[in-house]
């Protein structure tokens, strides 16, 4: 008999809670995503997260301890060697990643692009982090006139290749992306995802077509999601979760346009009758505010998210469990534009916790979440991680 019929796992993308013990190895000494945002805002207003025990993990400006937190609380340390989204999420579901995925804030190395040019017979232009629409405005006309390939990246571990469908036929663009995928499996490039970005239209009026194709990496082993799916449990992936695991172990995928849309979809799944896992990633914190080093926007987004939690609390049933965590840090007042190596918060709440919660021991790996989910549903336990299921008292 499952202790909880439904588990709702929410990953607040990049919401770290202070430097990890190994932060120095990553150039991240002093990083503190929520703490620095709270200082910048002169106090963060997150009353619902505070009720769950956020301030009991650590007090910050505006975020205080409460005498009787509704849920259980602690922080988790990442065991894997990366600090990117895929590494964090894969570890949450029971895998360790020894080779970090690479990000390319200065563009890709010349030797990689030389090899790609040689193997495809087409010249490469761009080679920098950019938004997909802006790069088309800048280079779309040149691409059409020369038949070259627009290669660009983002703050994530991606290599994107854009070409006009009438200049580079789709079949050829897909072949080119497969070549890029092969080349970037090399450890020194290790890119999480290669994306074909075809477009149409005229200069000044280009649009990306729905013929996008992703060449992702499958997780390097079986995750708890695979075990759930194979045992006929539901695994509902909301936001970019399905992309992060390349669809592995997912039974239903709900796309999102924003954090608020993500919260809407979470409420939708709360209204669904299912047995298994609902897994949401809220990416705006990271993509719109962390990488852009915008502490004000980040703080406002955290407060907006917090204001949606009462809808979630209201719909949770006695045999539901809500788990809230993050996948890495991205301190908006830290140097650079990259993620930061931090502890992440963990909050666990169910309406059945009539006496409220208390502190859980510090988690030595994000995989403790996967182990807890696996134990709850009686599926094969991941190789890594220690379940805290029995520490959650009703």
UniProtKB/Swiss-Prot annotation:
One of its GO terms (cellular component) is cytosol. It holds the Pfam family Metalloenzyme. Isomerase that catalyzes the conversion of deoxy-ribose 1-phosphate (dRib-1-P) and ribose 1-phosphate (Rib-1-P) to deoxy-ribose 5-phosphate (dRib-5-P) and ribose 5-phosphate (Rib-5-P), respectively. Belongs to the phosphopentomutase family. Mn(2+) 1 binds at residues 13, 327-328. Pathway: Carbohydrate degradation; 2-deoxy-D-ribose 1-phosphate degradation; D-glyceraldehyde 3-phosphate and acetaldehyde from 2-deoxy-alpha-D-ribose 1-phosphate: step 1/2. Binds 2 manganese ions. Its cofactor is Mn(2+). Coiled coil: none annotated. It is found in: Cytoplasm. This is Phosphopentomutase. It catalyses: 2-deoxy-alpha-D-ribose 1-phosphate = 2-deoxy-D-ribose 5-phosphate; alpha-D-ribose 1-phosphate = D-ribose 5-phosphate. GO terms for molecular function: magnesium ion binding; manganese ion binding; phosphopentomutase activity. NCBIfam families: deoB, PRK05362.1. Gene3D superfamilies: Alkaline Phosphatase, subunit A, Phosphopentomutase. Keywords: Cytoplasm, Isomerase, Manganese, Metal-binding. It comes from the Bacteria. Its EC number is 5.4.2.7. It comes from Bacillus cereus (strain AH187). SUPFAM superfamilies: Alkaline phosphatase-like, DeoB insert domain-like. HAMAP family: Phosphopentomut. It is an enzyme of class 5 (isomerase). One of its GO terms (biological process) is 5-phosphoribose 1-diphosphate biosynthetic process. Mn(2+) 2 binds at residues 286, 291, 339. InterPro entries: Alkaline_phosphatase_core_sf (IPR017850), DeoB (IPR010045), Metalloenzyme (IPR006124), Phosphopentomutase_DeoB_cap_sf (IPR024052).
């Amino acid at each position: 008999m499952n202790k909880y019929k439904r588990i709702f796992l929410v990953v607040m993308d990049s919401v770290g809670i202070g430097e990890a013990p190994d932060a120095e190895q990553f150039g991240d000494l002093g990083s503190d995503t929520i703490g620095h945002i709270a200082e910048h805002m002169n106090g963060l207003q997150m009353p619902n997260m505070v009720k769950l025990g956020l301030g009991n993990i650590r007090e910050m400006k505006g975020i205080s301890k409460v005498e009787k937190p509704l849920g259980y609380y602690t922080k988790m340390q990442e065991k894997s060697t990366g600090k990117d989204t895929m590494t964090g999420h894969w570890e949450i579901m029971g895998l360790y990643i020894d080779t970090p995925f690479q990000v390319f804030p200065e563009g890709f190395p010349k030797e990689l692009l030389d090899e790609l040019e040689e193997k495809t017979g087409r010249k490469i232009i761009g080679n920098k982090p950019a938004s997909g629409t802006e790069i088309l405005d800048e280079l779309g006309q040149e691409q059409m006139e020369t038949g070259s390939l627009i290669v660009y990246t983002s703050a994530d571990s991606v290599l994107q290749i854009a070409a006009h469908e009438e200049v580079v036929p789709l079949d050829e663009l897909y072949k080119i992306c497969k070549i890029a995928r092969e080349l970037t499996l090399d450890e020194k490039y290790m890119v999480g995802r290669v994306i074909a970005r075809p477009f149409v239209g005229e200069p000044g009026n280009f649009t990306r077509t729905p013929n996008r194709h992703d060449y992702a990496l499958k997780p390097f082993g079986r995750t708890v999601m695979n075990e759930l799916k194979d045992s006929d449990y539901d695994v509902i992936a909301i936001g970019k979760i399905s992309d992060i695991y390349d669809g592995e172990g997912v039974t239903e995928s709900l796309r999102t346009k924003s954090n608020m849309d993500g919260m809407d979809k979470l409420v939708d799944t709360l209204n669904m009758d299912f047995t298994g896992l609902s897994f949401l990633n809220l990416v705006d914190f990271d993509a719109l505010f962390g990488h852009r080093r915008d502490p004000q926007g980040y703080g406002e987004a955290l407060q907006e998210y917090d204001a949606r939690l009462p809808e979630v609390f209201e719909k949770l049933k006695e045999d539901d469990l809500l788990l809230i965590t993050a996948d890495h840090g991205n301190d908006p007042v830290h140097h650079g534009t990259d993620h930061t190596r931090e502890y992440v918060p963990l909050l666990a709440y169910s309406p059945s916790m009539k006496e409220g919660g208390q502190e859980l021991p510090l988690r030595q790996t994000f995989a403790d979440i996967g182990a807890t989910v696996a134990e709850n549903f009686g599926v094969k336990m991941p190789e890594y991680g220690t379940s805290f299921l029995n520490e959650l008292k009703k």
